[in-house]
Amino acid sequence: ATRLAKTSKAVRENLKFPDIIGLQEVENLGALQSLATRISTDAIANAQPDPLYAAYLVEGNDVGGIDVGYLVKTAVVSGVTPRVTVNSVVQEDAGELFVNPDASTELLNDRPNLRLMATVNFAGGQTSAITLVNVHLRSLNSVGATTPGSNGWLTDGERVRAKRQKQAESLANLVQARQVGSAAERILVLGDYNAFEVNDGFGHSFGVIRGVPVPDNETAVPGDGVDLVNPDLTDLATTLPVAQRYSYTFDGNAQ
């Protein structure tokens, strides 16, 4: 209940009721629906407009049971027209495989990317189509580990770096395929990249996803200097004041 209350307050008072919210580390659809209900209840109690969020989530592959999902505002803007019309929700590449050096395989995407295609409606009758891809990529845990690896990997760190790179390439290829399919499609990639916006030396997965990789010899991951996205994606964090360009505080350090 405390978490629901805090998240509801953040959505209402800090985020100001966004039209679409991408969420990560959600237990299941029921939990997301509970959050949507709590936001509505709190909004009404505080004399705020009820956003009538609809929840969308598809179960993924994570052993801990966490998934990515969306809250979409369906409050009416005119007549019976909702603020956002959801056209499709698709889980991408849930069965894609990660190949180890010994030729054994495992699922690449523990939390597969979730694509939502929607139309935002305005009171005056105008509409705007948008495609969102909600991501939660492999963490940085053990990225520099030197402990002996398995399945043909020399170290555990080598495996982590390779998996992070392959996830970045998979997402970049997804974005590029959609750009090639329709140059006019507005694509927004959001979520938890578990990556810095700069090259950290281990790898630069964020740059790979955006289409601005660093030269191969500047990271510990072989073969990551290939540009897979054209035109490049824009890092919207750069539109914020410098002091606000962080999404997490780790041991007192904003990052």
Regions inferred by a protein language model and the residue ranges of each:
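Divalent cation-coordinating acidic motifs and surrounding scaffolds
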Residues: 1-255
